[in-house]
Design a protein with these regions (language model features):
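Phosphate/pyrophosphate-binding active-site loops
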Residues: 1-128
């Protein structure tokens, strides 16, 4: 359907801009929030879609070394704010303080994956 193609092109655009702006953590947070907004707006009542959106949001933040918010905002549902926001910009403005209050991941303190899971058995065991 045409709607799917429009969302696909919008998400593709924001993904490409995200890659270009990886050096700027504020812009990464903004792009990640916009991708979350479009994801939630695309399938607002689909079971599990918000969970996937949160996974993408936090995955982008961690991959870009931006850290993640220490917890979800109290008494707020960010997915519903995305669904009900009139525009992506309005949504981003509303969640910007929450995203800025992030905790840096402790990833540098962890051993490299190939050292922590040196055998195929170890790697498969970690997935279970």
């Amino acid at each position: 359907p045409k709607r799917w193609k429009l969302y696909d092109s919008e998400l593709q655009y924001h993904w490409e801009k995200l890659i270009e702006e990886l050096h700027d953590k504020d812009k990464v947070r903004e792009r990640a929030a916009k991708m979350f907004y479009y994801w939630c707006a695309f399938g607002p009542l689909s079971r599990g879609s918000a969970c996937c959106g949160y996974a993408v949001l936090f995955g982008i933040l961690l991959a870009a070394d931006c850290g993640v918010p220490s917890s979800l905002p109290s008494e707020r549902q960010i997915d519903w704010e995305a669904i009900l926001a009139p525009t992506a910009a309005a949504f981003v403005d509303g969640v910007r303080p929450w995203l800025a209050d992030s905790v840096e991941a402790a990833l540098p303190d962890l051993p490299p994956p190939d050292e922590a899971f040196s055998t195929l058995r170890d790697r498969l065991g970690a997935l279970l």
